[in-house]
């Protein structure tokens, strides 16, 4: 998947230096080449803000997004409450280069381990946020663990997971928790293929990012706040904002 290519991201970040841009917002990948590119932009006086996924680099102005550790903990809490019995739960992770996925997994595992020890968590690296990749991975999981009772998809590719669950005839009995409300996941909530969406309002992310960067450029004081973690089910879809 091209979204997981650090060299491409680093090249595009460096190209921003010659495009007359005043500031750059980006979704980071954990890779030395990306860190180097951000440091170079900082050297040119171009401020940068990380969005959606955390990034430990002193050159950035700040991070805008949800508390992803909290999002993972929320998913773990809901999984445990929806599955009050012993069983296996799978984590589908999009990729190791996004800190957001690491944070969500840590939060999820922490809550399951401390509050719901009767659940056995198995982890897979999944299909790198790809629909077909997640479909294949979910098919393998269902074949290997026929007693699987819950799935937490940390990243994208929800359509692939639902397709596999439906083909196996287990969508209605599987507890499935994923991220980001879209026209697809909205329908999955309505037909029962998904139980819960952990959501971040991307409109708020964009607005907060612009405020952060403009305040920095104008040397104004800016009090940054985290974007709220939203929990969406089929019962509170009305008025919910898509990603």
PLM features: residue spans?
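Short, high-confidence coil segments that cap the C-terminus of an alpha-helix
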Residues: 21, 86, 145-148, 194
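Hinge/cleft segment of the Venus flytrap/periplasmic-binding protein
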Residues: 112, 204-243
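A conserved helix-loop-strand patch within extracytoplasmic ligand-binding domains
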Residues: 71-89
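Short hydrophobic segments within beta-strands
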Residues: 51, 92, 152-153, 232
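Hydrophobic alpha-helical
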Residues: 23-42, 108, 126-184
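Hinge/beta->alpha junction and helix N-cap segments in small-molecule ligand-binding domains
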Residues: 1-8, 30, 64-74, 91-110, ...
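Flexible loop/hinge segments that line or gate small-molecule binding clefts
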Residues: 33-70, 182-190
